[in-house]
Every structure is written in structure tokens, then in C-alpha cells.
């Protein structure tokens, strides 16, 4: 069987699909990915075929800013996530991706498509080809009103391609793979008959390269170790890191902060001896050495919770405010 996976061009959307893609490969199926050209090299470095399709995250955001200026101007938070994001995904990202994705599907001829639940062009392309599709969770289930808003926005694209995906834009039609722990997941998951719970037992962030654990990690003093990450999208502002590190610098803890691919730790200046800065280290390699995680509230919360790490969530944008509230409600973390 040939399976085409699609995702937005970011690690937070690609990495959750990696364990499923690798499981399919081990089972003898042929797997490929379709994502923005700017991210294809990351997919290929993880060992998968990659087809370019759609806009980069920055181009997607800029196009959405021009298309929905009032909603784009909303401050980061729940309202912006529920009103601006679905229109960006369905009204900007999906049409741009569909124009590239439909020809890929016609040429490569997959038997099944698997897409991250924020990537909304896959159901359109799959429906045109007459094949089934499955969505894969990122973290929490999207609020129903948000999914309906995306479905309404996607309707114009569906009409232009001559398909009818219904009010939810094709989401949850055949199968939804839910990797979120039940204790954290939104109650709306019970209203999705095709939801199938899964637990990823394979480290997904190895998709980001063959990085090694720095030798100094195993030589840290015997005291609690705090890990700081702001993910791979909201990690561009050094001021955010400085504020967190300043608060931790005088504490009797080890601090490990990863700044992101290509980031220069020297940009944050001199740090106390207990603070260690790195550009990128796979979280899967660090988890066994950590006691607490300070996070923006993206996909990293799932492997952290799998290890039983308490969380301090500092949401920056997108779904992170929802995720922070869920962690607080479940008693697994605090929100700052």
C-alpha cells in the first residue's frame, strides 16, 4: 500500500506523524510526505521521500495577514486561535497546498492519505482521487466551533474542485489517530466515532537529525534539572529566553535551554554556571535527565508527560493557550 502523509511545514506538525509513518514502513508499506518545499529537506533527512506542496509557515502567515487583517491583529490568546487560525489554515494554507497536492496525488497514486489535523488540503485531494484519509492529532482536539469555522471557510475550495466534504471539511470522516493522553484530551473526543487512541512508543524528534547528547549532561551536579524550550516557531525572541533564564539563574538547579536549530547561544550573553545553552538537542535524549520542563506548550508536552515530568507552560501563540489550560485542569502543570 502507498501512503501519502501531509503536514504543515514545521516540526510540531511533522514529528507527531513520524512514528506512524515509520510503523507503516516497517509493515512493508511505501510512505512519502508532502509539505512546503522549505521543509522538504527535514523530511528527507528523516529518511522519507518528500514532495513539495504549499507555502512556508512565514509565507502562510503573511498571506493570512493580508487576507484577514482584523483577525490577525488580535492579541495572542484563545480568541485569535479560534478565529484567525482556522481561516488561515482553510482560507489561505489549504488552497495554496491543494494546487500542488492534487497533481502529486494524481501522479504518485497513494492508496491512503494521513494528515496532521491542521493540514486541511489532504481531504480535498483524497476526495478528488477517491481514496480514504486519516487525520492525526497534534496535541489537543480542536474546539468544535473552530473546526466548523474551518469547514465553512474550506467550502469555497471544495466547490472549486467539485467535492463536498461537509461542515467539518472532511475531518474525522474515516479515521482520527489520537495520541493525546485521555486525562489531558478534550471531552469532545467522545463525539468522534472514528477516533482511535494511540500511544507513540517511538521517539519522534529523532526526525530532526542525528544529534548526540552533549557529554556534559551526564556530568551535571546531583540536583534538580530544569529544561527550557520555546519550541521551533516562537523561539526567535531572545528576550523571552532571557526572562526565563533570569528567573532560574539564582536557583539551586541545573538549567538546560535549547534555543532552536541554527541559534547561537552566544547571543544570550554570559550565563551563570548552572545554565547550559544549546542550539538543538533531541528531547528524547534529554528526557531521562530532566525533573521539570518549562515549555511554550506545543507538542513537547506529550513526551514530557509520558515521562511524568511536571510542566510550567508559558504559552506564546497558536494552540498553546488551550494546551496550557488543559495541563492546569489535569493537574500536570502550571501556567505562567
Language-model-detected regions and their locations in the chain:
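Donor-nucleotide binding loops and adjacent catalytic segments primarily
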Residues: 198-292, 300-301, 321
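Nucleotide-activated sugar donor-binding and catalytic core shared by glycosyltransferases
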Residues: 1-8, 19-32, 45-47, 143, ...
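Conserved nucleotide-sugar phosphate-binding/catalytic loop shared by glycosyltransferases and other
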Residues: 32-83
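A short, glycine/small-residue-rich beta-strand->loop->alpha-helix junction that serves as a flexible
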Residues: 5-18, 235-238
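Alpha-helix C-terminal capping/helix-to-coil transition sites in glycosyltransferase folds
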Residues: 107-109, 172, 288-289
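A nucleotide-sugar donor-handling region in carbohydrate enzymes
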Residues: 36, 40, 152-225, 230-235, ...
